[in-house]
Amino acid sequence: MTLMDPLADAMATIKNNEMVGNKECVIEPASKLIGRVLKVMQEYGYIGSFEFIDDGRSGKFLVKLVGRINDCGVIKPRHPVKKDEWEYWEQRYLPARDFGLLIVTTPEGVMSHYEAKERGIGGRLLAYVY
């Protein structure tokens, strides 16, 4: 069986394990994009530590959960966002102002929408977490 969207599968795995109350989960297959998204989630305190496990194939991520996620998921299609449109997309995908975060990919790498706003750059929406 092939996966159509490994990032969507990873976010669903995190959400399901968080809802059940598990303290850790395994995300497979691993990719650079998933690793960068996990790093942004870790910076904002939505997950604890995570580590890459090399299994001889594509690898896995072992993620420690801290119980802060109410909902998370990917944004499809991956809308392009200009530097002055962040407010519109915050209202569309986040439940309240200054609550949660959008994860975006920009020419400068994967980051939160707060950081992209601060730097004055646009990008493409990848995921949301709150």
Swiss-Prot record:
Pfam families: Ribosomal_S8. Gene3D superfamilies: 3.30.1370.30, 3.30.1490.10. Keywords: Ribonucleoprotein, Ribosomal protein, RNA-binding, rRNA-binding. It comes from the Archaea. InterPro entries: Ribosomal_uS8, Ribosomal_uS8_CS, Ribosomal_uS8_sf. PROSITE patterns: RIBOSOMAL_S8. One of its GO terms (cellular component) is ribosome. Signal peptide: none annotated. One of its GO terms (molecular function) is structural constituent of ribosome. GO terms for biological process: translation. Part of the 30S ribosomal subunit. NCBIfam families: PRK04034.1. One of the primary rRNA binding proteins, it binds directly to 16S rRNA central domain where it helps coordinate assembly of the platform of the 30S subunit. Belongs to the universal ribosomal protein uS8 family. This is Small ribosomal subunit protein uS8. It comes from Methanopyrus kandleri (strain AV19 / DSM 6324 / JCM 9639 / NBRC 100938). The gene is rps8.
